[in-house]
């Protein structure tokens, strides 16, 4: 999969400080976001479809990857680039049959074993978390605050890209990237920011810096 996944926005209009999802997406695109995932679980299917049509146009014009959370049917209806699936959604294999071989299909996981299973059945990337405490996503006891060490264990177990999610901000992005993640996914860090475009640029800068630092050789302890 030849898609940049360093910065990944998950939309949530009810956490966007009174602004529309399309406004947030436009600002994030201006700030250089790599991926936009349409979530909007609090809206009706019709409303989500309408938002999805607009976001598809926005992302297509900007060359930004567009995914839909959970709903394979909606992803197909708005011609999204793919879908992100959780434990209660369609299996990766079923989603692939509907969306085709070129679709990008992500899978949420919180353990190395689940990560390996997802890779084995054809997931293109993994959303790993919640890395830190979060109020924007319902998580099970197993997946609550898994921490950077589990991110490392998962990245060591698979060969597909790993995206950290859950409680991530520019201030802790370095820790997540150093743990082995290829990128970070956020909601509030962008959607609640006074300037979502600037927040996106700040997040990208944090990822870029952390990526460079993670490739530097470790300093040997002094004798």
UniProtKB/Swiss-Prot annotation:
Q: Which NCBIfam families match?
A: thiE
Name this polypeptide is given: Thiamine-phosphate synthase
Matching Gene3D superfamilies, A to Z? Aldolase class I (3.20.20.70)
A matching Pfam family? TMP-TENI
Detail which positions bind 2-[(2R,5Z)-2-carboxy-4-methylthiazol-5(2H)-ylidene]ethyl phosphate.
134-136, 167, 187-188
Residue positions annotated to bind Mg(2+) are: 70, 89
Pathway the protein acts in: Cofactor biosynthesis; thiamine diphosphate biosynthesis; thiamine phosphate from 4-amino-2-methyl-5-diphosphomethylpyrimidine and 4-methyl-5-(2-phosphoethyl)-thiazole: step 1/1
Q: State the protein's purpose.
A: Condenses 4-methyl-5-(beta-hydroxyethyl)thiazole monophosphate (THZ-P) and 2-methyl-4-amino-5-hydroxymethyl pyrimidine pyrophosphate (HMP-PP) to form thiamine monophosphate (TMP).
- GO MF terms held by the record: magnesium ion binding; thiamine-phosphate diphosphorylase activity
Q: How is the cofactor bound here? A: Binds 1 Mg(2+) ion per subunit.
User: What cofactor does its activity depend on?
Assistant: Mg(2+)
The UniProt entry's GO biological process terms, in alphabetical order, are: thiamine biosynthetic process; thiamine diphosphate biosynthetic process
- What is the protein's species of origin? Haloquadratum walsbyi (strain DSM 16790 / HBSQ001)
Region named Disordered: 197-223
- Biased region (Polar residues) positions are 206-217
Enzyme Commission identifier(s): 2.5.1.3
Any one GO CC term of this protein is: cytoplasm
- The family this protein is said to belong to: Belongs to the thiamine-phosphate synthase family.
Task: Name the catalysed reactions.
Answer: 2-[(2R,5Z)-2-carboxy-4-methylthiazol-5(2H)-ylidene]ethyl phosphate + 4-amino-2-methyl-5-(diphosphooxymethyl)pyrimidine + 2 H(+) = thiamine phosphate + CO2 + diphosphate; 2-(2-carboxy-4-methylthiazol-5-yl)ethyl phosphate + 4-amino-2-methyl-5-(diphosphooxymethyl)pyrimidine + 2 H(+) = thiamine phosphate + CO2 + diphosphate; 4-methyl-5-(2-phosphooxyethyl)-thiazole + 4-amino-2-methyl-5-(diphosphooxymethyl)pyrimidine + H(+) = thiamine phosphate + diphosphate
């Amino acid at each position: 999969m030849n898609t940049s996944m360093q910065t990944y926005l998950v939309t949530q209009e009810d956490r966007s400080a009174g602004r529309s999802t399309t406004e947030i997406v436009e600002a994030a695109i201006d700030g250089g976001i790599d991926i936009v995932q349409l979530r909007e679980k609090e809206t009706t299917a019709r409303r989500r479809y309408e938002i999805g049509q607009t976001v598809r146009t926005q992302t297509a014009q900007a060359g930004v990857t567009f995914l839909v959370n959970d709903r394979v049917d909606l992803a197909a209806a708005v011609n999204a680039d793919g879908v992100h699936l959780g434990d209660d959604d369609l299996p990766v294999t079923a989603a692939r049959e509907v969306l085709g071989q070129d679709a990008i299909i992500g899978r949420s996981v919180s353990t190395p074993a689940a990560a390996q299973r997802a890779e084995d059945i054809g997931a293109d990337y993994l959303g790993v978390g919640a890395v830190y405490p979060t109020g924007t996503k319902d998580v099970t006891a197993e997946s609550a605050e898994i921490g950077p060490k589990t991110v490392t264990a998962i990245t060591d177990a698979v060969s597909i890209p790993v995206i950290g999610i859950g409680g991530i901000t520019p201030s802790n992005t370095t820790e997540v990237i150093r743990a082995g993640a290829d990128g970070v996914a956020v909601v509030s860090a962008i959607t609640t920011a006074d300037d979502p475009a600037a927040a996106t640029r700040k997040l990208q800068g944090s990822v870029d810096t952390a990526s460079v630092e993670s490739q530097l050789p470790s300093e040997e302890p002094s004798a």
